[in-house]
């Protein structure tokens, strides 16, 4: 097993590295993760997406290698588009406790269907 595979397989989300946010100003962090992959829970075929993460930190920020490793843990998991984005959103919201957070998964088309999943802490439900 190569070192990257080992890091991904051994990554424990409970120990995700987060750092203190010492900034006094409110600001937005935007992270793009263009190589997300998970496996369809029905067929096992791979699904690919770009994940867009935006958040306004409060006391903590996520370390960039930690978020990369966490996202890569989905690579061999059988999980739906909806479940994967909701899990990422909930994990980061629980770990970082940001003032505001949004996670978007823009999935590559498969079978002529393009899916975008969005979770946001200030989501307004359309009527």
UniProtKB/Swiss-Prot annotation:
EC number, as in UniProt: 1.7.1.13
Query: Which reactions fall under this protein's catalytic activity?
Result: 7-aminomethyl-7-carbaguanine + 2 NADP(+) = 7-cyano-7-deazaguanine + 2 NADPH + 3 H(+)
| Recorded GO MF terms | preQ1 synthase activity
Q: Which residues form the active site?
A: 40, 47
Taxonomically, which superkingdom?
Answer: Bacteria
List keywords of the entry alphabetically: Cytoplasm, NADP, Oxidoreductase, Queuosine biosynthesis
Q: Where in the cell is it found?
A: Cytoplasm
A single Gene Ontology CC annotation of this entry is:
cytoplasm
Q: Which GO terms describe its biological process?
A: queuosine biosynthetic process; tRNA modification
Q: Which SUPFAM superfamilies match?
A: Tetrahydrobiopterin biosynthesis enzymes-like (SSF55620)
This protein's pathway reads: tRNA modification; tRNA-queuosine biosynthesis
What does the entry list as the binding residues for substrate?
62-64, 81-82
InterPro entries membership: GTP-CH-I_C/QueF, NADPH_dep_7-cyano-7-deazaG_red, QueF, QueF_type1
Task: Relate the protein's function as given in its record.
Answer: Catalyzes the NADPH-dependent reduction of 7-cyano-7-deazaguanine (preQ0) to 7-aminomethyl-7-deazaguanine (preQ1).
Q: Which NCBIfam families does the entry mention? A: QueF-II
Family matches, as HAMAP family: QueF_type1
Q: Which family does it belong to?
A: Belongs to the GTP cyclohydrolase I family. QueF type 1 subfamily.
Protein name as catalogued: NADPH-dependent 7-cyano-7-deazaguanine reductase
Report the source organism: Campylobacter jejuni subsp. jejuni serotype O:6 (strain 81116 / NCTC 11828)
